[in-house]
Swiss-Prot record:
<dbReference type="InterPro" id="IPR034733">
    <property type="entry name" value="AcCoA_carboxyl_beta"/>
</dbReference>
<keyword id="KW-0444">Lipid biosynthesis</keyword>
<feature type="binding site">
    <location>
        <position position="230"/>
    </location>
    <ligand>
        <name>Zn(2+)</name>
    </ligand>
</feature>
<comment type="subunit">
    <text>Acetyl-CoA carboxylase is a heterohexamer composed of biotin carboxyl carrier protein, biotin carboxylase and 2 subunits each of ACCase subunit alpha and ACCase plastid-coded subunit beta (accD).</text>
</comment>
<keyword id="KW-0276">Fatty acid metabolism</keyword>
<comment type="similarity">
    <text>Belongs to the AccD/PCCB family.</text>
</comment>
<dbReference type="GO" id="GO:0005524">
    <property type="term" value="F:ATP binding"/>
</dbReference>
<keyword id="KW-0934">Plastid</keyword>
<feature type="domain" description="CoA carboxyltransferase N-terminal">
    <location>
        <begin position="223"/>
        <end position="487"/>
    </location>
</feature>
<dbReference type="InterPro" id="IPR011762">
    <property type="entry name" value="COA_CT_N"/>
</dbReference>
<keyword id="KW-0808">Transferase</keyword>
<keyword id="KW-0443">Lipid metabolism</keyword>
<dbReference type="GO" id="GO:0009317">
    <property type="term" value="C:acetyl-CoA carboxylase complex"/>
</dbReference>
<protein>
    <recommendedName>
        <fullName>Acetyl-coenzyme A carboxylase carboxyl transferase subunit beta, chloroplastic</fullName>
        <ecNumber>2.1.3.15</ecNumber>
    </recommendedName>
</protein>
<keyword id="KW-0150">Chloroplast</keyword>
<dbReference type="GO" id="GO:0003989">
    <property type="term" value="F:acetyl-CoA carboxylase activity"/>
</dbReference>
<feature type="binding site">
    <location>
        <position position="227"/>
    </location>
    <ligand>
        <name>Zn(2+)</name>
    </ligand>
</feature>
Length: 487
């Protein structure tokens, strides 16, 4: 590979740099005219040096290593010449095609030309006046942070071409350990480490950093979430999983919804130890039902697809059940039905208002008719709760709410509230189109369409939801335990 050296940058500080781009000199096309006020030199294919005064024809063909915009004019491999505080010299070379870093310690040829130029009489004897076009103020200014400047250029270049965030040349006591943290964006948009990405030295070919050292990214995945509509990043805790850029509503876990609605320190879960026993011994060639249950439990930390319990909402005691779509699609089996039934019976005995947050794909097919009978069982206890005891039940429909949940307790609330843009239906769009051989109109199963047709009472965003629920409860004579509990 032919090499062309240009743009020497150095200072009298602890670090000295030289930048290189591997590209033939005859392929350097003028990208834009630049005004050059610093003293620079060029090293061509015949290893001849030219100052800007001697070969002024290059002034329009070579850009300074000043910004990422200038670097982008040369799409090729990069090498940086470094001399650390311990007087050790080496270069970091990046091969774009192979995506590997290579640290080279054999720089005798480069050092010869570098120090020859630094000690030249032309450099030492030239004028330092204001009118001198060759005067470089950064050589005199030892406070100029060349390290940060180069790091910024490299970061911008790598981010714009191969989605790498790099932190080069850490100025530490052990300057030979210059760690390069690289985080490569996968197709799903999440940050992950590149498995085949290695850094090696020419001297001993030993790996300085391997893929195992990048567990840092896992810690940040808990703080940030990516919108699946516009792919923007947002902080989980502040935005309530609502994209601040496009307004798209992302899915929330049952624990997040409990935290959103219930006052801190007042949540008392019920029937946490209730698990499915595979009542019909469902057989599957792909994966046994018990294995799917175990896998979902490990992934979500839940025993089944619903959390039930009691707590306080702005000081008002309530009974709350929240379905979790991450647990087998929020499907309703015997455990889900039994937990919701027990919650309603407890709310009936204690005269508590009831909230059920629905997020489900329907009845769980692995439990057959036992899952279908949960629809009738829950509807039966709800009838006693609402009609006989005259208590107040609010149903909150989130995306998606379909199947047996929609056909039973999901649409039985005294007040039915939906989140914006929620997908609410009995049969899914694909099932309807395959059965009827007709296209389903776009948006006909969205919450906004159902509200216009009178199937919903209100569409409430997540931010004011807790306040709206509190006002509805007080309107129906459910008040806080103490006046000071209202926030």
């Amino acid at each position: 590979m032919e090499k062309s050296w240009f743009n020497l940058m150095f200072s009298k500080g602890e670090l000295e740099y030289r930048g290189e781009l591997s590209k033939a000199m005859d392929s350097f096309a003028p990208s834009e005219k630049t005004t050059i006020s610093q003293d620079r030199f060029i090293y061509d294919m015949d290893k001849n040096f030219y100052g800007w005064g001697e070969r002024s024809s290059y002034s329009n063909n070579v850009d300074l290593l000043v910004s990422s915009k200038d670097i982008r004019n040369f799409i090729s491999d990069d090498t940086f010449f470094i001399r650390d505080s311990n007087k050790n010299s080496y270069s970091i070379y990046f091969d774009i095609k192979k995506q590997k870093f290579e640290i080279d310690n054999d720089l005798s040829d480069l050092e010869f030309f570098f120090y020859s130029y630094c000690s030249s009489s032309y450099l030492n004897n030239r004028s330092k006046g204001d009118n001198d076009l060759h005067y470089d103020p950064y050589i005199k200014d030892t406070k100029y942070n060349c390290t940060n400047h180069i790091n910024s250029c490299i970061d911008s270049y790598f981010r714009s071409h191969i989605c790498i965030d790099s932190h080069f040349l850490s100025d530490s006591k052990n300057s030979n350990e210059n760690y390069i943290y690289n985080f490569i964006c996968s197709e799903s948009g999440k940050i992950r480490e590149r498995k085949n990405y290695k850094i090696r030295t020419n001297r001993n070919r030993s790996n300085l950093i391997s893929s195992k050292d990048f567990a840092i990214t896992q810690n940040y995945n808990k703080l940030w979430i990516q919108c699946d509509n516009c792919y923007g990043l947002m902080y989980k805790k502040v935005k309530m999983n609502v994209c601040e850029q496009c307004g798209h509503y992302l899915k929330m876990s049952s624990s997040e919804r409990i935290e959103l609605s219930i006052d801190p320190g007042t949540w008392n879960p019920m029937d946490e130890d209730m698990v499915s026993a595979d009542p019909i011994k469902f057989h599957s060639r792909e994966e046994p039902y018990k294995n799917r249950i175990d896998s979902a439990q490990k992934t979500t930390g839940l025993t089944d697809a619903v959390q039930t319990g009691t707590g306080q909402l702005n000081g008002i005691p309530v009974a709350l059940g929240v379905m979790d779509f991450q647990f087998m699609g929020g499907s309703m089996g015997s455990v889900v039905g039994e937990k919701i039934t027990r919650l309603i019976e407890y709310a009936t005995n204690q005269c508590l208002p009831l909230i059920l947050v629905c997020s489900s794909g329907g009845a769980r097919m692995q439990e057959g008719s036992l899952s279908l009978m949960q629809m009738a069982k829950i509807s039966s206890v709800l009838c006693d709760y609402q009609s006989s005891q005259k208590l107040f039940y609010i149903s909150i429909l989130t995306s998606p709410t379909t199947g047996g949940v929609t056909a039973s307790f999901g649409m039985l609330g005294d007040i039915i509230i939906a989140e914006p843009y929620a997908y609410i239906a009995f049969a899914g769009k694909r099932v309807i189109e395959q059965t009827l051989k007709k296209a389903v109109p776009e948006g006909s199963q969205a919450a906004e369409s159902l509200l216009r047709k009178g199937l919903l009472d209100a569409i409430v965003p997540r931010n004011p939801l807790k306040g709206v629920l509190s006002e509805l409860f007080q309107l129906h004579a459910f008040f806080p335990l103490t006046k000071n509990s209202i926030k």
